[in-house]
């Protein structure tokens, strides 16, 4: 006779997580969209991603296909993605996106620095000299004066552009 408070070993309670069919479909669509993003990447960038050989081959095929064949191949890529762990792939994709936004932000900072250099003059040039000791102080002063004159006389902003190019070169060489 079984006791009331005890359960049989085969009746152990497990936490069962039920996933609705709609939620499963949405997950599959997300994987397919991730696959579409991978198809849009250049082969040199794609080589850096942690992908299985089958998935890499399917992505290369999809890059060659057109229209309906490409649509079917994208669905196949979505199916292959179900067997992959999407997190490392998503992280690598986010890193690429973030790199572009960081570069854009850096260029915006350089533009602001250039504008301040033209408006405020020597004080900002000194800031630049501290940050980039290899910079030519005299050249910056000369270009800042020239940019002010060009702006006042409504001439093309040649010095304005040249200051930005010098700052950009200094910024890019700083990373090396």
Swiss-Prot record:
One of its GO terms (cellular component) is cytosol. It is found in: Cytoplasm. The keyword Magnesium does not apply. CDD domains: YjgA-like. Its main location: cytoplasm. It comes from Aliivibrio fischeri (strain MJ11) (Vibrio fischeri). Member of a network of 50S ribosomal subunit biogenesis factors which assembles along the 30S-50S interface, preventing incorrect 23S rRNA structures from forming. Promotes peptidyl transferase center (PTC) maturation. It comes from the Bacteria. GO terms for biological process: assembly of large subunit precursor of preribosome. Belongs to the DarP family. This is Dual-action ribosomal maturation protein DarP. Keywords: Cytoplasm, Ribosome biogenesis, RNA-binding, rRNA-binding. GO terms for molecular function: ribosome binding; rRNA binding.
């Amino acid at each position: 006779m079984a006791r009331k408070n005890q359960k049989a070993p085969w009746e152990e309670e497990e936490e069962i997580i039920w996933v609705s069919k709609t939620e499963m479909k949405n997950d599959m669509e997300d994987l397919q969209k991730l696959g579409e993003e991978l198809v849009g990447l250049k082969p040199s960038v794609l080589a850096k991603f942690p992908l299985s050989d089958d998935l890499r081959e399917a992505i290369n095929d999809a890059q060659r296909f057109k229209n309906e064949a490409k649509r079917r191949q994208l669905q196949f890529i979505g199916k292959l993605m179900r067997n992959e762990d999407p997190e490392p792939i998503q992280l690598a994709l986010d890193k690429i996106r973030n790199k572009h936004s960081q570069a854009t932000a850096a260029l915006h900072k350089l533009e602001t620095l250039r504008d301040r250099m033209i408006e405020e003059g020597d004080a900002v040039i000194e800031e630049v000299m501290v940050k980039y000791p290899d910079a030519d102080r005299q050249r910056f002063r000369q270009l800042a004066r020239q940019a002010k004159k060009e702006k006042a006389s409504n001439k093309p902003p040649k010095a304005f552009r040249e200051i930005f190019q010098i700052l950009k070169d200094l910024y890019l060489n700083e990373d090396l």
